[in-house]
Structures are given as structure tokens and as C-alpha cells.
Amino acid sequence: MNNGIIFDIKEFTIHDGPGIRTTVFLKGCPLACMGCHNPEGLSKTSQVIKSLASTRLVGTKYSPQELAVLLNRQAPILKANEGGVTFSGGEPLLQAYFVAEVIDLLNNLHVVLNTSGYGRERDFLMLLERVSLVYFDLKLIDRQAHIYYTGSPNDRILHNLQVLSASRVPFVIRVPLVPGVTDTRDNLSAIARTIQALPGLLYVNLLPYNKAAGAKYRALGMEFHPVYDETSPVNIQADCFDQLGVKVSVA
């Protein structure tokens, strides 16, 4: 049995897949993206988060059975609203065996995997066998830029994108728009060229920058010094995708 660590469980979410969903946020991520909007999901261990109102511990351990029981209790309302369960993070691939065990215990619920794609191929394939839809985050195509802004190269991510396409599990590409970093015309055009012919692609979802990230870092006692100007408006250049016939939406 593989126990997992969760930093949040959000009920009645509407942006993490079809219908009304429960989103499970797994703790721990191999990337260190500047401006991550869930910094409480970066560490694999529990952390204390402080605010003016309270101090609380973020990171709860669950067995697969415990989490499955909780999710199955919600199954009737999720199914009635054409929804299901979404596993997000952090990075679910870091806890792939735990996630797989939980999915195997669910009562025929629709499952979405939200991933950066940064993980072992065998772990990704194991989860692809169990999910109905994938939300795949794609930030930067240029390798050196990816290293600079996330702390890791993107070779594994781009490889797993091909693995995903070959699996024929339908997927959505999510692009977090960080001002001056991921929202440039060069980067968005490169993403469009990379994905335009991939089987299984449903559409691209552009996600404008979340300016609340800085407050979360401070509450966790973490430094937040972005090299970009977070006050700048993001460039939503949907035409980069339109020109290549790629369906695009903006969150």
C-alpha cells in the first residue's frame, strides 16, 4: 500500500475538467517554476502556513482507502452533474502509485489527471491506463529558458507529451501565461507548432497569471523574487493558435 500526502481537497470545482468535480491536490513537485500559484504544493513534506487570521499545517497523509472512501461519498452528486475527480498538484506523477491505487478503488468516477508531464514514462503510462482525460501543462518550448524559469530541462516533458498523444487519451494543453516569460509571441507560436498535429488534442487553455502567488510564498516563509514584472498585463495572443487551426480558450 502506498500512502500519499495531500495539501488540499477542493469540492465543487468547475475549472478542472467537465462538470462539477472534486480536485485533489497532491503535495510535492519536481519543478521550481517562478511564480508557481500553488507554492504550498512544491515540498513533499508538511508545512506551516501563516496568515493574520490563523496558523495551519498544510499536508495531510492519506492511505488509498481513506481517500477513496472520501471521494466515493461524493460520487452521487459528481455523477449527477456529469463531473468526477481531478488529481492535480504539485505533481501527481511524484505519487503515481498512490494515485493509481486510489483510482482503482473509485466507484466508476470520471478521472482527470492534471500534470506538468515531468515524471517517469512508466508512471505516466500507469496513470494513463486509468484516466479519462489529461490536462497537460506546457510552459516553455525553449530548453534553456525552461531550465532558467523552472529549474529543470523540458526534455522529459516533451517526451511524455508524445507518449500522451500516442496513448489516445484525450488531452487539453494548459499554458500558464507569465508576463514576459511564457506569454511572448515566440513562445506561444512554438507551443502551437509543437502541438498542432498531435492526435488526441482537444484544445489549448490559456491561463492568465495569478497575482496572488506572492502572498502564498510569504505565508509559507518562502522567498518570492520574480525576475519578471508581475504587475505587467499578460499578452493573450490566441491568434498564435488560431493561425495553425488549433482550438484555443482563455480561462
What are these regions (language model features)?
Residues 1-18, 179-251:
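Auxiliary Fe-S-binding modules of radical SAM enzymes
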Residues 68-212, 218:
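Conserved AdoMet/S-adenosylmethionine-binding subsite of the radical SAM
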Residues 20-22, 31, 38, 92-93, ...:
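Short, flexible micro-motifs
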